[in-house]
Amino acid sequence: MSQKPQQTGTSDVIKVRYEKLDALKEAGRDPFVITTSARDVLTETIKNNFEEYENKDVCVAGRLLSKRGKGKVSFMDLWDRSGKIQIFAKFDDLGEEEYGFLKKWDIGDIVEVKGFVFKTQMGEISVHAKEVKLLSKSLKPLPEKYHGLTNTDLRYRQRYVDLIMNPEVKDTFVKRSKIISSIRRYLDNQGFMEVETPMLVANAGGASARPFLTHFNALDEDLKLRISLELYLKRLIVGGLEKVYEIGRVFRNEGVDTRHNPEFTLMELYQAYTDYNGMMDLTENLYRHVAQEVLGTTTITYNGIEMDLGKPFERITMLDAVKKYSGVDFNEIHSDEEAKAIAKEKGVEFEERHKKGDILNLFFEEFAEEHMIQPTFVMDHPIEISPLTKKKPENPDYVERFEFFMNGWEMANAYSELNDPIDQRERFKAQEALLAQGDDEANTTDEDFLNALEIGMPPTGGIGFGIDRMCMLLTDSAAIRDVLLFPTMKSLDSDKKPSGIPKTKDAVVEEKIDFSKVKVEPLFDEYVDFETFSKSDFRAVKVKACEAVKKSKKLLQFTLDDGTGTDRTILSGIHAYYEPEELVGKTLIVITNLPPRAMMGIDSCGMLLSAVHEEEGEEKLHLLMVDNHIPAGAKLY
């Protein structure tokens, strides 16, 4: 007998399916001993070439996603990787025994059908079954046909079900594959060589980010997961591989939101004997090529906004962009103190360690970045934020660097690469000073990389592309998780830590409250009638993404799954109490039927519930978080 699920409350549907499997085994038809299929054509090939296949014998195989019919005639929809086709089966053709087994097939079963191609009286291209075989038994039912799988958290966790139930999801990942293939073809045709470099590194340099830490037992050495591809690729330029690129995963121990995932796909390339101007030309041509090849057009639409990759991309310096959108001319600011003063005047937050160049970058992020909708190269960054880049000869306070923007997002980052080992050592020293001041994203000195530069690196241009953001734009996907097959998710049993695995973060000590020092607001004297109260719609929601709202010190923007299949946006002024990344994956309570309220130009649709009290004169706030087993959309009574 097949071992059935032991948990209490197992559905009758699952029980019946296990019983069907037992019956198949007893009849000598165990589907799980079958190792192959005679499939010789895909369903879409038949449908796209009907005249060629009409009345011809074919063998198709795939998943059964619908069945209908009565008595001695059955119709079924069979799906394979290319699409679906209707199966027509008759008792008279298959015989009593085979037709009897076919009638016991369930939605989700994987089957093989041999027969001939024809059109029904309704004009639907179909396969008239002559032989049928069950290849694999589905023991758990798929989500109900018309509602499908809409719970966003569950879609990400069970992507295999998501791909079955939501064809548009599969289309997204087919396009992603084509995008990456198109990038490779373009670069290969331009004479670039694809390489692979280490993921486990002793020194995680090449970017400003917090790395993941691990320990290599065999060498008894602490290592890090790479945060960039840069430094090893530059070593290859030194070695004479003049045009190299890598497409690979990098890892940054940072927050999760609609555009960030801790592991993501990066493409970096380096080309000897060119500079950042050459990288601009390459970027423009590459984006145009990929869009045309994958989408058939150089005009793309994202979230209703049209962007034209066919026109020459705009080029603007960071200084000019800040002046244009903030009114502040940093050419007229000559000291760090002046920069801090104007930042205070404009309400731009900064840290005391920040210098003029850092503050210029903060101004760009605050005032200009959101306006970079059409393809735009923002050039000539301050040296303070560009430790691996060549200085501009005419103004050494700035470097030959650009960031490529679309839709207000940074899509790529490129340099005229620094190849002066003496200058590079000084930059590393400056980074180590920042590290000593508490900047855990600063780099340490990489002596082997300096040794490579001392051997001699030719003038080089380099660029890094975020593949995931590129896929978001070209597939019109709302969140980075929608273009990652298996995005990073908080484990459902994350509280059950395996023994012997060290935590990378200090255990949280539960805060003890002296309730004698707590003050709460008095209860209301006025009553609300039950009818009025019952009109408030309290729902459980899952936090898909959370990020700080630009230009606001208090607001967090939540992207929520409320069970409807459409993301809900709510803004809440709780940044003083929570960091965005710690709320992703939580289950919260909201009132959903409040009218939208515009906050910082964003419609907030509902209100998060929280508990507030005062303790020794300081306000404390706790969001109402509930058990993650409660599904999105569950109503509170």
Regions inferred by a protein language model and the residue ranges of each:
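Conserved RecA-like helicase motor-core motifs
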Residues: 569-570
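Short Gly/aromatic-enriched secondary-structure transition segments
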Residues: 78, 555-560
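Class II aminoacyl-tRNA synthetase catalytic cores and aaRS-like
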Residues: 1-521, 525-526, 531-542, 564-566, ...
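An active-site-proximal beta-strand-loop segment
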Residues: 547-548
